[in-house]
Amino acid sequence: MLFLLSPAKSLDYATPAHVAAHTQPLFKRQSAELIAVLKAKSPQEISSLMKLSDALAGLNVARYEAWSPAFTAHNSKQAVLAFNGDVYAGLDAKTLGEAQLAWAQDHLCILSGLYGVLRPLDWMQPYRLEMGTALVTGRGKNLYQFWGAQIADYLNERAATDVSPVIVNLASEEYFKSVSRKVLKARVVTCVFEEWRGDKYKIISFMAKRARGLMVRYAIENRLATVEKLKGFEAEGYCFDASASAVDRLVFRRGQGA
C-alpha cells in the first residue's frame, strides 16, 4: 500500500534533523521550471496570486530567490521533518527511528505544488506553493495542468510491484485532484475522520488533518500491508464505523456513540 498526504504551509527548518539519511527529490527539473516562473513575479504579484500578507509574500519571494537546483544539507531538510502543522503533529516524524523512516520512505508519498511528489526523506528547500494556485506556466493555466499525468504515472510506477496495488488517500481534495484518476491504475481507499458535534458527526478540518497524520503513524508503527488492517486504527479515541463506511471509503468516528 502507498499512503498519500498533503504538505503543510508551516515549515520547521530551525530544528536539526535527527537522522542523516536522505534522498534527492524526483522532479527537480519541473521544480526549477516553476521556480523560474515564480522568480519573475514581484512581491505584490505573489501576494495577489497566493492571497498572502505583504510580509509572507516577501518571505516567499526571498525563498524563490534562494532556491537552488543543488540540494544540500545547508539549504534543505528531509520533507517529513521539515513540514509542520496539524497533519505532521499527528505523524510526529521526529520521534520515528531510522528503520521506521525507511519503511515510510517505501510507503508514503507527500503531494506538493512545487515538488510534485516528495518521499519522506527527500531533501526539500523551503517554499510556499499550494496545489490550487492559478499559476500560469508554459504547460497551462494552473498547477493541475502543469503536473498533468506526471504524478499518477509516478504512483503507477511505485505500485507496479504490488499484486493488488492500493493507494490510501489521506490527502486533501485540493491535492488529490493533482492525481489523474484516468491514468491511475491502483485501487483508491479514502479515510474519513469525523467528530460528534451537536447532534451529528462532522468533519472538523484541523482534527481531521491531525487524524490523517496519526493514521500514517499507525501504519508505520505496525507496517500495515492490507486495507483490512487500517480498520484497527484507534488513536486518540477514533473508532472504525463499519455502518458509515463503504468498501473504498473508511469512516472513523470519535465522540457520542462511536
From Swiss-Prot:
Q: Which domain of life is it from?
A: Bacteria
GO terms under biological process: response to hydroperoxide
Q: What's one Pfam family the UniProt record gives for this protein? A: H2O2_YaaD
The record's InterPro entries line, in alphabetical order, gives:
YaaA (IPR005583)
GO (cellular component) term, any one: cytosol
Q: Indicate the family of this protein.
A: Belongs to the UPF0246 family.
Q: Which PANTHER family match?
A: PEROXIDE STRESS RESISTANCE PROTEIN YAAA, PEROXIDE STRESS RESPONSE PROTEIN YAAA
What's the protein name? UPF0246 protein Pnap_3166
Q: Which organism is it from?
A: Polaromonas naphthalenivorans (strain CJ2)
